[in-house]
Amino acid sequence: QTSDIKVLQELCHAAGMALKVTTLKIVIYDAAEYDAKPAAKTFKYGDKNIISYKLGTSLTDTAYTSCHVSYTDPDSKETIEYTYTPDSSTGTGQVLEINEKVRNTEEAKTLAKKRLREKNTQELTASLKVVGDVSFVAGMTVKLKGFQKFDRKYKVTQAKHSLTGGYTVDLSLKQVLEGY
């Protein structure tokens, strides 16, 4: 049996939406829209508030150049296809292939953008241990500056606050992709 939160996560994923659970409420939002907002904080290399950091790159199931959506209706045998390539594409030349139900080309376009974005945000990740600050929460965006190829905006995917050995926050970050 599947839990309610798991069902909700699956529904959000299918719709290309993001889900955030806090102590008192569940928040569902369009990640692309939210990510377009200005970063709440900028961390500069050498900043005394950064206790430690780790930067990572993954090319496994990420760094796609475009996304091709193709769906054939089993009843009408009509095939709906759409390929999306963002203007800012710097991928590997790989095409992400998606076969999910869509009713028209507009739905295929929306799905292609969301699925490509979902995969490519996993390419660059970072984790920071910083001096404690209650304003750090999952879902907010921050910028890294002075970290060379990692200089960009990131979404906080997890913020673990700890009082052991002094107040610190462990931030898990994944890159924000703007424009799609």
Question: Which residues make up each language-model segment?
Answer:
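Short beta-strand-centered interaction patches in the first periplasmic/extracellular domains
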Residues: 1-52
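An acidic/polar, Gly/Ser/Thr-rich interaction patch typically located in mid-to-C-terminal regions
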Residues: 50-180
